[in-house]
Each structure stands twice: as structure tokens, then as C-alpha cells.
């Protein structure tokens, strides 16, 4: 092995504060591409694949952040996985103890790395320890499945989720920017908490989810209809929608901006950001003997200029 490689191994495996910092950085400088000169960029390096792999936890394969732990033989892993493996090194089976890999933490501090959502469109580069915070709010990050009828764990981009809703949840897809839906329930007095996603609308080349829910608002049973946009909040603000329900020369109307599916259906419901219909009024609109819910909700979506 070359002398430089041996020095790097010793530096990465050591947790001693007396190790020469220039030795610890030797391999990084050899395998990393310097950034352009500028404020705050001196001494920072774009990560090469080799250094990047050193920072991947061998158990969960996620990038490691302080405290980075190591066993007496120098094998590293993240603090979360240290608990999962019951303090035993998964590589050599030695007891882990409480040894910090300070050298690797210092190496990470010198790196600038791309966002994990680079393949989805994010082209920004971040200092290693700022990357995680950015990714929690990156506008290119994956979306959660917007289906409201169950706690679905599927995530992905919008085309993936549209196919998932259609194929796995059997949600109706509708082309157009107007809707006219009739809700029928034979036992409305027994429905205290329920949620339905009736359809997904393809409108202006984008997708919108129409929700209808029954829940208690304080002591009053109510129904609520609202729209969510399959995209981020900034894009959602480019659209508006209206909802209307009524009968017997009376009607309720609602106009607003669709919420992004970044906000869960429960969050939208709890904020009361939609058309709210008291159950007694809904049954009045239903006609007949008020024992069956027959509620027609109409509306449209338009694009703000």
C-alpha cells in the first residue's frame, strides 16, 4: 500500500485529537475537485465517490452525521444504527463502545455535496452538514401518496403517484376542469368520521384531488369538500377553484386556492379550508325524508392570470 493510503487509513480510524490535520486531508485533496473561488468556498471540496462512500453507514446506507461511531478496528456506522445493532460492530463483531470517529467528521465538514434529489431536478450544491436540512424542504423531494382512505406509505414524483392512485387505490380519473358529483349515504346519522377521495382531475395539464369528508366540528357533525393540488405550494397558488351545493332555492358556495398535497388531507380538514356543510343542512338539501344523504356538489377549476 502507498504511504499516503496508509496515512489516510490511520487518520480515518483514529479518534485522537493529536492526529495531524494535513494527513487526514491528504486523500480528500487527491480525490476531490475544488470549487470555484468565492466567498466561503476556500478549503471546500466537491465530494468524490470514494470519500462519499466512506460517509455511508454500512447498515442503513444513509449518509452519517455526528456523532459518527467506530469500533476498535475502525469500522464506522451512524448513531441510529449503533442502537439497532446492540453495540456490536456489524463488520467484525467487536464491541463498539463509545469511540467517535472525529477524523471522518472533520473530512465531512470539508465537503460540498449535491442534493439527494439531483436526479429529480435540484442542481444545488451544499456544505455536507447543511445538506440534510435543505433536503427536508427541497421542492424536488418526493411527495407522499395523497390517498385519504388509508395511511399509505408510498412516495414518489407526481407521475408515479398518479399511476399509483389509479392502479392501486382504484381512484377515478377525470379529464376536465369542471365537476358535478353526487354523494349518497344510506345511513348518514351513523357516519361520524369518514373520508373519501372521489376522483383526480386532469386539468391544465396538472392533477387535482377532490376530497369529501364527514367529521365532528366541535359538537356538530359536518361534511366537507375540498381540493388538493398534486404539486408544490407555489404552483398551487396559480390556480383557484369553486364548490357549490344547494337545493330548494338555497345554496352554499366556496372559493379558494387548492392546497398542495405537501399538506396532509387531515391538516387541510382541521384548518377548515374548504366547503363545510352542517349535516342538518346537507340532509335538507337531500330532500325526501332526510334519512338518506343525496348531496350534489358542483364546481370548477381555473387558472389565475
Curated annotation (Swiss-Prot):
Q: Which residues bind Zn(2+) 1?
A: 115, 122, 134, 138
Q: What is its EC number?
A: 2.3.2.27
Any keyword Transferase? yes
CDD domains given in the database record = RING-HC_SIAHs (cd16571), Sina (cd03829)
Compartments where located: Endosome, Multivesicular body; Cytoplasmic vesicle, Autophagosome
Top-level enzyme category: transferase
Q: Name one GO biological process term.
A: ubiquitin-dependent protein catabolic process
Q: What is its main location?
A: other
Q: What outcome is documented for mutating residue 75 to Y in this protein?
A: Loss of ubiquitin ligase activity
Amino acids binding Zn(2+) 2: 145, 152, 164, 169
Q: How does it assemble?
A: Interacts with SINAT6. Interacts with ATG6 and TRAF1A. Interacts with WAV3. Interacts with FREE1. Interacts with ELC/VPS23A.
Q: Which PANTHER family match?
A: E3 UBIQUITIN PROTEIN LIGASE SIAH (PTHR10315), E3 UBIQUITIN-PROTEIN LIGASE SINAT1-RELATED (PTHR10315:SF168)
* Protein name, as recorded: Putative E3 ubiquitin-protein ligase SINAT1
Q: Which organism is it from?
A: Arabidopsis thaliana (Mouse-ear cress)
Amino acid at each position: 500500500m502507498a504511504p499516503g493510503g496508509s496515512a489516510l487509513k490511520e487518520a480515518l480510524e483514529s479518534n485522537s485529537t493529536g492526529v495531524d490535520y494535513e494527513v487526514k486531508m491528504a486523500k480528500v485533496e487527491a480525490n476531490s475537485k475544488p470549487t470555484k473561488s468565492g466567498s466561503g468556498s476556500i478549503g471546500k471540496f466537491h465530494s468524490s465517490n470514494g470519500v462519499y462512500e466512506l460517509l455511508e453507514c454500512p447498515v442503513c446506507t444513509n449518509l452519517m452525521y455526528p456523532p459518527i461511531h467506530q469500533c476498535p478496528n475502525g469500522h464506522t456506522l451512524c448513531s441510529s444504527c449503533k442502537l439497532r445493532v446492540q453495540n456490536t460492530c456489524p463488520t467484525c463483531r467487536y464491541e463498539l463502545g463509545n469511540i467517535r470517529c472525529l477524523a471522518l467528521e472533520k473530512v465531512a465538514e470539508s465537503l460540498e455535496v449535491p442534493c439527494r434529489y439531483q436526479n429529480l431536478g435540484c442542481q444545488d450544491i451544499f456544505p455536507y452538514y447543511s445538506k440534510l436540512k435543505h433536503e427536508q424542504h427541497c421542492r424536488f423531494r418526493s411527495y407522499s401518496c395523497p390517498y385519504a382512505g388509508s395511511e399509505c406509505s408510498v412516495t414518489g414524483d407526481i407521475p408515479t403517484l398518479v399511476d399509483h392512485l389509479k392502479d392501486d387505490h382504484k381512484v377515478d380519473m377525470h379529464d376536465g376542469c369542471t365537476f358535478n358529483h353526487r354523494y349518497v349515504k344510506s345511513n348518514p346519522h351513523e357516519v361520524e368520521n369518514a373520508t373519501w377521495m372521489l376522483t383526480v382531475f386532469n386539468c391544465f395539464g396538472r392533477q387535482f384531488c377532490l376530497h369529501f369528508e364527514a367529521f365532528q366540528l366541535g359538537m356538530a357533525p359536518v361534511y366537507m369538500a375540498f381540493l388538493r393540488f398534486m404539486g408544490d405550494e407555489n404552483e398551487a397558488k396559480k390556480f383557484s377553484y369553486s364548490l357549490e351545493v344547494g337545493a330548494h332555492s338555497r345554496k352554499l358556495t366556496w372559493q379558494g386556492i387548492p392546497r398542495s398535497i405537501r399538506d396532509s388531507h387531515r391538516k387541510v380538514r382541521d384548518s377548515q379550508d374548504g366547503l363545510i356543510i352542517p349535516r342538518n343542512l346537507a340532509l335538507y338539501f337531500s330532500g325526501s325524508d332526510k334519512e338518506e344523504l343525496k348531496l350534489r356538489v358542483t364546481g370548477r377549476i381555473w387558472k389565475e392570470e
